[in-house]
C-alpha cells in the first residue's frame, strides 16, 4: 500500500507573473495554495518603477506635465487634470469656464475609453472572447476624437496649467453628440452578452467579496468602493472643474463582489455619457487659458488636490519652495491603494478566481510602480 501521507494536503507556492497576460502588466503574485484553495497572496511590485516623483524635482512645473500621463496611461487625461488642478491651487488661479467645460468632456470621454479597455480585457481573461472586439471598436471612436483634438491617442498631454493649449476643432461638439448617441445602445449590447449570461454570472457572483468596512479599512476608492454600497464619488463629494453643475447619479451596489464591480462600471459609462451631453450643450464662450505666466513660479506653499479618476481617487500633493521647480510632488494612485486589498479578496477562494478578482480591480502597473 502507498504511504497515506502522499495524499495529505500540502501547501504549494505558485508564482503568477511578473510576465502573465491576466495581470495586465509586470505584477508578480505569489499564491499559497492548498489544492485549488488560495490560502494567501503576496504581491511583488516595482518592476515598472521609473522614479516619476523624483523626476518632478528636476523639471519645471510645465516640463513635468507630460510625465503624469505615463502613470495610468489608459486614463492619461485624468492624470493630467489632477496635476494641473494641484498646481493651479498652488498658483491660486482657476481655469476659465470654457476650459473647465472642455476638460470635463474630455475627462469623461477618457473614463469611457478606460472602462471599455477594462471590460474587453476582463471578459477575455475569464474566457469571453467576443466583447473585446466590440469594446475596442467603440474605444477607437473615442481615441479618434482625442487624436483630432490634440494629436495623440493615448498619452494626450491635453491640458495645461491654467487651462488648455488647444481650442476645439470644427465639428468637435457634433462629434461628441454623435458619440453619445451611438454609445448608449452599445452599452446595452455589452450587457446583453454578459450581464445575464449564466457562465459570466457563475464566474463573478459571490467572488472576491470586499465589504464596505473592509473597503474603508484599506482606503479603497472608486468602483470597488461603490460596489460595496458606499456612495462616495469626488465629483459629487468634492466637486471640481464645475462638476456641481451637472446632473448625474453615483452607481452603487451592495454585495461588493466581482459581479457588482462589473455592474457599477457599466452604469458609470452611462453616467459619463449623461455628463458629456450636458457639458457639450453648455460650452460657454470665452478664453481657454487663465492668467498664468510663461514661467510658472508658485509662491512657497503646498497644495493637495484629488479627483475621481476611472480607477478611484487620484491625488496630487505639491510642495513649492518658490522656485520654478517643485520641491516635492507626491502622487496618491488609486491602483496602488486598491491592490492592497487583493489578499483579503482572494483568501479562501479558488485559484480560478484570482484572474477574475485582479480584473475587477482594474489596476495599471505604470501607476502602481511610478
Swiss-Prot record:
It catalyses: a quinone + NADH + 5 H(+)(in) = a quinol + NAD(+) + 4 H(+)(out). Its EC number is 7.1.1.-. GO terms for molecular function: NAD binding; NADH:ubiquinone reductase (non-electrogenic) activity; quinone binding. It holds the Pfam family Complex1_49kDa. The keyword Cell inner membrane applies. GO terms for cellular component: plasma membrane. It is a peripheral membrane protein. The keyword Oxidoreductase does not apply. Keywords: Cell inner membrane, Cell membrane, Membrane, NAD, Quinone, Translocase, Transport, Ubiquinone. It is found in: Cell inner membrane. Its main location: membrane. It comes from the Bacteria. It is an enzyme of class 7 (translocase). NDH-1 is composed of 14 different subunits. Subunits NuoB, C, D, E, F, and G constitute the peripheral sector of the complex. NDH-1 shuttles electrons from NADH, via FMN and iron-sulfur (Fe-S) centers, to quinones in the respiratory chain. The immediate electron acceptor for the enzyme in this species is believed to be ubiquinone. Couples the redox reaction to proton translocation (for every two electrons transferred, four hydrogen ions are translocated across the cytoplasmic membrane), and thus conserves the redox energy in a proton gradient. Belongs to the complex I 49 kDa subunit family. This is NADH-quinone oxidoreductase subunit D 2. It comes from Solibacter usitatus (strain Ellin6076).
